[in-house]
Structures are given as structure tokens and as C-alpha cells.
Amino acid sequence: MSGTTAERQDAATGAAPAAAPAPHPPLEGAARIIGSIALSTAVFMNVLDTSIANVSIPTIAGDLGVSSSQGTWVITSFGVANAITVPLTGWLTQRFGQVRLFLMSTLLFVLTSWLCGFASSLEALVVFRVLQGAVAGPMIPLSQTLMLASFPREKSGMALAIWAMTTLVAPVAGPLLGGWISDTYTWPWIFYINVPVGLLAAWFSWRIYKDRESPTRHIPIDRMGLALLVVWVGALQVMLDKGQELDWFSSPVIVTLAVVSVVAFVFFLIWELTEAHPIVDLRLFLGRNFTIGVLTLAVAYGVFFANVVLMPLWLQRFMGYTATDAGWVTAPVGLFAILLTPVVGRLLASQDPRRLVTFAFLVFALVSYMRSGFNTQADMATLIVPTVIQGIAMAAFFVPLTAISLSGLDPARIPAASGLSNFARLTAGAFGTSITTTLWDDRAAFHHARLSEVAHPGSPGFDSAFETLRQTLDPARALSYIDGLLNTQAFTLSALDIFHASAVIFVLLTALVWLARPNRSGPAGGAAEAAGGAH
């Protein structure tokens, strides 16, 4: 009876149809291991690509004969397209099936990566990055869904742990790998490396999951909802990516983008909540656990990712680190994250996920507090210690929050829920990065002004330093050197302000997570029931 009105309504609301086929049993033995590796590899490749190009922008821009400012469209174009298609995962899954959609997305991601490497102009590269971002959207939510379906209910926490491990480590590894490839080879190779990796991931995924397809339904296309989604998300992402460059709301372009985004978002909410077949299931937010879980995850990830972006910027611009060296400072975060994430997955079967999240946020707060004591004389060992400790928090916050957001959900709604959750996470990361980089500049200007009140011509310290420098430099260069020292101190103090604020936010988030009421009837706090139903 596919295609009936009742089934279409079920598809739109996320409810399971009355005559749903029996769920697939969990995978066993080698099949589960191979399937998990294949899915994790695809996720790692996808998430890595969101950050690997960041440190290569100067090289790409120079090779294509454009400015670094124009080169940032390589990042913006991917982010906009990706943000639009991620929340469409639930609807696309109902049309094409989980396995088919995941394989199509992975193979198209490989193709567009190859095209990006062959691009000979900025215009061509931006077009291919738009296509790459668009096809990448469903990969992360569906990898989570398929991973959950591979494990028995009592091991759902472990499934989430394996998935989260690759999702969190990849953004940290991206700048390190991107810098190394750009320095050692040429920038197209940051895209070419996806080809063999993606093909292997797709082939093994097909071998393991080809007979585990989810049911499909011929539901109508919500054209108005799709159009409004494209407009408000696209305008928002461009505004966030270009806001600092255009001086935010002093620019008519940013003001226009903000107005368009807000108006389109309001109409999108109204339309999707009244449409019989919405393209995005906003009714998921009627669930307390989903709302609190997604909100907490979004805020925490926004602060976490903003700090991930800020550290390399500070190290490269004001501490004299190369891109590769800055990557080595941030890379150790993956040490404890990789080792402890499986442990957290096992703990989730017996512990209240809110306790694990609270522990993670307190560790994040400790790390931020430690960083707030940095200075320009800090050696690499001093910088690395908080990074290593942060890996403990990474292992303990992402998996339990995902379990909370899925707790109590009908299995048929998991793809849509995962898509919305990941959309909120990615958008929060963009918000956090834009807000943090803007605050960094603003607070640096404040500190520079305060420092200049002390270090100015006529003050003993300034005059002494100036006379010393004049022995080897002309007056203009001596003044420029002193101003450079003030800038370094000002931006360092500004970074410390942000680290301190991050610590406060993480402490406050410990209260927010306790507003959730995860179902404790299942082996993993209710998340296992939702996850296990995805089989």
C-alpha cells in the first residue's frame, strides 16, 4: 500500500507505518567490524574535508591567482551547501532508503573531490565545492543510523562511541594533514586523497549493508519548504562566513543577508509546522530529550569548535608557529579521545548519560581555565598539556548527548533526528567560530588601547626600549617593532579572555543538561531502545 495517504502522513510526521517490515538483526563478528570501519572511514573523510582546506587557502589562492579573501569562498561554498542538505536527510531517506542514499552520497563525494582537484580556476573550484558539500550532507547522519543498526541494543552506546570518535578527531586532524600536504605536495592532493579512501569505504559498505535497505515511500516533494530552507540557511552561512571580513552590520550586504535569513526562517517555521508532508520534521523538537540534547550539544560544540579554530590562529599569527607545528600542538587531543571513547560507550549502558556529560563539561572548563593562564613565553609542552586533557572531555560529552537526544524516539525518526542534530551542531560551529574571531579582534583592540596607555613615548619603559632598538634600527622601524610587541600581547590577552569565558560557559552547561529526562528503561538509558530499533 505504498503511496497511500496514511503512509504519506506517517512519513511526514516520522511515525512508523502500521505494517512496517521486521527490523534487520544486528551484524555479528567480522561483518560488524568491517561495517564499522567502512562507515567510520567515510565519516572521517567527510568531516576531515570541512577543515582540511582551511590552512591551504593561502596556497590555493596564490596558485589560482586570487586574493586570500576570495579564496575563502572555497570554505564558504562547501559549508553553505552542506548545511542545506544535512537536515534533508530524513526526507531523502524515506525517498531512497538509508543504504542507497549513503552509498550514492559517498560515491558522489568521491567524484566531486576528484573534480575539485582538477579545478583550474576559482570559479570552477567553488562550483565543485558546492556540489561536494551538497552530496556530503546525508553521509554523517546516515553513518550514525547505520552504525546503530549494526550493533545489538545493549551495545548501542559502543556504536555511538565509535561514530563519535571519528567525528570529533577529524576536525583536529584536518589542519595538520592539510598543512603537511600543502607543504609537501600540492593543494589538489587535499582532495585527491578522498578518491581511494572513499571508493574503499563505499565498496565495503555496499558489501556489508546491501541487503539491509530501509523501506522507501513515495512522498511528495515539499518544494516551498525546500526553497525556504535553501534561502535562510544559505543567507545565514554566507553572513557568518563573511561577517568579519565585511565588518558585520556596518556592511549593507551583511544587513541584507541577516534580514533575508530571519524572514525566510520565520516563514520556514510556519510552513513546515503546517505542511502535511514537511521536508524537515520540526515536530521532533516537541520532545523534551531531543530539544535539550540538541541544544546542549550545539552550544557545547560551538564553544569547543571555536577554541579549536582560535588556538592555531593565535599560534601562527603571534607565537611564530608554522601551520604544521600548530597542528602538532592541537593534534594530541585525539590521544585520550580515541582511547576513552569506547570506554564511555560501555559506561553508557549502566550510567546516567547526564553524569557523563557533566563530567565532560567540567573537564572542558578545567582545560579552558588552564589555557586562560597562557602567555607569550609558553613553550610547546605547556601548550600541549591542556590539549591532551581535553581529549578526556571529547570522549565523554558527544556520545552521551547523542544518546540523550535519541532517547525515547521512534526508530523510524532516527535518520531525521540525526540530520537535525548534526545540522544544529554544524551551524553552532559556524556561529561559534564567527563570534569568537570577532570577539578576538574587538578585545584585542581594547587591550591594545589599555597597553598603549602605559607604553607610550615619555614613559620610562617605552623610552628605554626605544633607545635600545635605535642602536640597530631606524626610528620608524623601532616604533613599528614596539607596536608589534603590543599587538602580540593584546591578541594574547584577548585569547585568554575567550578561554576564560569558555570555562564559564561549560560550567553553566552542566545545569542545562539536567533538564533532560532520558528514559532509563533500556540498557543504555533509553537511547538503546531508539538505536536498537534502527536495525
Task: List the predicted regions and their residue ranges.
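Transmembrane core module of solute transporters
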Residues: 30-94, 99-102, 113, 117, ...
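Transmembrane alpha-helical cores of Major Facilitator Superfamily
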Residues: 44, 76-80, 107, 161-165, ...
